[in-house]
Amino acid sequence: MPSYAVLGATGNTGRAIVQVLLDRADTDTRIHICAYCRSKEKLFRVCPAAETSKSLSVFQGRLDDDSLIDECLRGTDAVFLVVAIVDNMPGCTVAMQTAEAVVASLQRLRATDPAIRLPRLVILSSASLEPTFCNDVPAPVHWVLKTAVSHLYRDLAAAEAYLRAQSDWLSATFVKPGGLVHDQARGHKVCLDRAQTPLSFLDLAAGMVEVADADDGRYHMRSVSVVPASRVAIFPWDGVYYTFTGLLFHFCPWTYRFLGEYKLQSRKERDKQA
């Protein structure tokens, strides 16, 4: 049966993927979803259908819980790496930590069963990391947008390089959308040469599921985008706020301690993870 793991199931993209898969499970009972998150209660709050679905299993814990992540990934056909944060946190390593945890888990599973069929990895990234996807964006605007998310993009680029280095035994696709908004699904298209802003999280999720279902190797180690099939009416106004704060955190990273969304790690905590 088709089986999917969603790492970061309570985030904006993760919950949208869970919802898209649950909608499909209504008509295809073979589908199984493994939702990995830090809080089961939050998952049920942001995606109420998950609480009663027989097609979904919740794996609650941290990414450094080896046995839990092994259990979550075992037997899946595709894994969505969508753990993310919303602002430009200095020293962010969320994408890299997720990539390392998944690679380590798949290595353990392969060591236990050398004949195991490994899942395809579908990784959330950004169009700003693929210059050809942003050809229609004026250079000054692109510079501002890229600088406002500089710490996150550095993390995403490092994770992508790390995963590409595993191409001899892993299959991965890097999904790089434009600006995202909370809006209804309007239809989507997987695109190889451009991105488009705005794009709804639900359309992004549907596109990522389409990529995950492509088992013919067409997206192996490729960068793709998802574009809306029709114009999205909602403008990403919250992006304006995050652009201003992101620029502040880029040029004055010390201000994040007072204005950022998340708690900064201490040097001791970073050294412990390394």
Curated annotation (Swiss-Prot):
The pathway this protein participates in, as annotated, is: Mycotoxin biosynthesis; sterigmatocystin biosynthesis
Mind listing the UniProt keywords for this protein, alphabetically?
Answer: Monooxygenase, Oxidoreductase
Keyword Iron-sulfur listed? The answer is no
Question: InterPro entries under this entry?
Answer: NAD(P)-bd_dom, NAD(P)-bd_dom_sf
Question: Superkingdom of this entry's organism?
Answer: Eukaryota
Choose any GO biological process term that the UniProt entry carries and state it.
sterigmatocystin biosynthetic process
Provide any one GO MF term from the record: monooxygenase activity
- Conditions for induction: The genes forming the sterigmatocystin biosynthesis cluster are co-regulated and induced on oatmeal porridge or the fungal isolates were grown either on oatmeal porridge or in YEC medium (0.2% yeast extract, 5.0% corn steep liquor). Expression is positively regulated by the cluster-specific transcription factor aflR that binds the palindromic sequence 5'-TCG(N5)CGA-3'found in the promoter.
- EC number(s): the record gives 1.-.-.-
Q: Which PANTHER family does the record cross-reference, listed alphabetically?
A: FLAVIN REDUCTASE-RELATED, UPF0659 PROTEIN YMR090W
**Function, in words:** Oxidoreductase; part of the gene cluster that mediates the biosynthesis of sterigmatocystin (ST), a polyketide-derived furanocoumarin which is part of the most toxic and carcinogenic compounds among the known mycotoxins. The first step in the biosynthesis of sterigmatocystin is the production of hexanoate by the fatty acid synthase (FAS) units stcJ and stcK. The polyketide backbone is assembled by the non-reducing polyketide synthase stcA by condensation of the starter hexanoyl-CoA and 7 malonyl-CoA extender units followed by cyclization and release of norsolorinic acid.
Q: Which family does it belong to?
A: Belongs to the avfA family.
The protein's name is Oxidoreductase stcQ
Show the taxonomic lineage. Answer: Eukaryota, Fungi, Dikarya, Ascomycota, Pezizomycotina
Name of the encoding gene: stcQ
